[in-house]
Amino acid sequence: MEASYRKTFNPCFLATGVGSLPHQDARRALRLVAQTLPQTPFWPQLPKHRILESMIIQASPGLPFLRVDEAKGEVHFDANLDEAKELEKVYRSYLARDVEPYRIPLGYADGFEGMVRHLEERKPSSLQFFKGQIVGPITFGLAVKDGNGKDIIHNEVAFDGILKGLLLRGRWIIQRMKKVCQEVILFLDEPGLCGYGSAFFSVDGSTISRRLNETIEEFQGQGARVGVHCCGNTDWSLLLSTKVDIVNFDAWGFFERLALYPEAIKDFLSRGGVLAWGIVPTSEFTGEETVEVLIEKLETEFRELARKGISEETLRERCLLT
């Protein structure tokens, strides 16, 4: 693991983006990021620019058992493929650390290619880190069905091979990002965790922890700080107890749910963890949320956690804004 990763990370209210932007024009999206976040840029994911940039499809090309229908923007499990050959191919690459077969193909990540190119040509002297994202293992495993119509995460053999391919894709992303900035943050997008705890959620907590930690440790081993982004509510104690470096939550709409777990938050912060506060509303944005309103809401939330015994000084030091 690289020495830079072992340093304590105190972002102290630095801001970055979660990842997806609604732009249809990639150049406009890149210009917005470059102008507003020169210290802490992220590469924008642009599903409205091209459906191939949606998080499941973007991560899928070349993974074992899967086929992408580019015309329809769909990912399918191909039950006709030779299981042994599919697994042999991905495990051979994984053991050899060969990431090239798992690079993101051209046309699947214009935002990524554009931001890397921008930093190669015009890297700001104030650059502190470069942030990217990839779909997390739980969300991916619940989004794709196997040949029997089951969530692929429950097909242990196939999913382990698919996850190894996803880990290789993440390695490639990190290595590419590090060519332009040594300090890399990679978020795992996990909207699928919002369903955890309901009667309809089919994955148990031990599987969630095991698969998340496998992914987190893999990317930490590449020298990246790893975050998990969950846009709704989940069992925050489960997520905070993983080996994740950064937990990104919706501080505008779901702070009260996170605040139910003060002991888990304290333990997470004591290990050097960072809370990324999604204080800027997206789906609930009305146009009346001024900077002053957002600051006051953030201060109120800090005070609430301080009343629960969490150091406000530590909260401020370990605060990233999204």
What are these regions (language model features)?
Residues E100-R117, E156-W172, V293-F302:
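Glycine-rich anion/phosphate-binding loops
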Residues A143-D146, G197-F200, E288:
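Short acidic, glycine/proline-rich loop/turn micro-motifs
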Residues M1-D151, G273, E301-I310, E317:
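Alpha/beta catalytic barrel-like cores
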Residues A59-V90, I208-Q220, A224-N233, V247, ...:
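Non-catalytic scaffold segments within catalytic domains of secreted glycoside hydrolases
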Residues G132, K150-D151, E156-P262, P281:
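Active-site loop segments of alpha/beta catalytic cores
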Residues S125-F129, C181-E183, G223-R225, V244, ...:
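A general structural motif
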Residues D245-T322:
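Catalytic-face loop-and-helix region of soluble metabolic enzyme cores
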